[in-house]
């Protein structure tokens, strides 16, 4: 994973124009409920996210050019109200060189972020050249056509069965999709070898809406 973080950090560093590589770490995949969260659970999530931000900052320091400073900070977006909070959205502005989305639950994540000012800010940053990366669920949301998981009691060994997958490719005004600015010609899956997901990735291609590449 260190190599992955360094690759992300290198892309963020390449976007930097003032000697300070600004990266925002986003835990909107962490919640169990997209609309409410307890104070203790929020604090525990923030502690974990801060740890991950430290790893990302270290990865950046390893690849930054001489004279560049790396700053990775967590933006506390965990539920939908957070994604609509102007104070949080302001931290996703034009000065950001990279956005990193943490792992968790991609279906919760899209219910938190879809069609919010925060998603619009991420899209604007991406369009301006900022790096956007993620791991686990944070990688899953990076494709517009998203694998949400399995349906019902289906699991990895049902991956080739039609209807076994929870596939998200609703219209832009829904939350049944990956990020609106995500990869349009590919679908991203994760933990493919560790969790036996090759079959479900193949099935996602069979059921795909239009031509897609599996990543």
Predicted regions and their residues:
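Extended, subdomain-level signal for the structured scaffold at the beginning of enzyme domains
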Residues: 1-107
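Extracellular/periplasmic catalytic domains that process cell-envelope and extracellular macromolecules
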Residues: 14-16, 91-95, 124-127, 179-182, ...
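General beta-strand structural signal in soluble alpha/beta enzymes
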Residues: 100-101, 132-135, 214-215
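A generic structural signal for alpha->beta connector loops
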Residues: 69-71, 129, 212
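Short, solvent-exposed amphipathic alpha-helical segments in soluble enzyme
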Residues: 7, 202-207
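Class I SAM-dependent methyltransferase SAM-binding "motif I" and its flanking Rossmann-like core
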Residues: 110-198
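Short, intrinsically disordered, charge-balanced linker/junction segments flanking boundaries
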Residues: 207-215
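First exposed extracellular module after export/assembly in secreted or surface-exposed proteins
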Residues: 95, 200-201
């Amino acid at each position: 994973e260190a190599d992955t973080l360094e690759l992300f950090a290198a892309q963020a560093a390449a976007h930097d124009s003032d000697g300070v590589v600004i990266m925002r770490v986003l835990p909107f995949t962490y919640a169990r409920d997209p609309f409410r969260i307890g104070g203790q659970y929020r604090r525990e999530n923030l502690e974990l996210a801060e740890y991950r931000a430290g790893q990302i900052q270290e990865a950046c320091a390893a690849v930054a050019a001489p004279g560049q400073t790396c700053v990775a900070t967590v933006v506390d977006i965990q539920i939908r109200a957070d994604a609509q909070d102007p104070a949080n959205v302001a931290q996703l502005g034009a000065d950001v060189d990279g956005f990193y989305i943490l792992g968790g639950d991609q279906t919760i994540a899209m219910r938190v972020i879809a069609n919010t000012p925060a998603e619009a800010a991420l899209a604007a940053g991406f369009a301006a050249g900022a790096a956007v990366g993620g791991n686990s669920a944070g990688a899953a949301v990076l494709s517009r056509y998203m694998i949400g998981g399995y349906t019902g009691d289906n699991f990895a060994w049902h991956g080739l069965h039609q209807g076994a997958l929870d596939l998200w490719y609703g219209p832009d005004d829904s939350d049944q999709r990956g990020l609106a600015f995500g990869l349009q010609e590919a679908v991203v899956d994760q933990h493919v070898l560790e969790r036996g997901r090759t079959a479900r990735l193949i099935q996602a291609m069979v059921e795909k809406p239009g031509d897609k590449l599996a990543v």
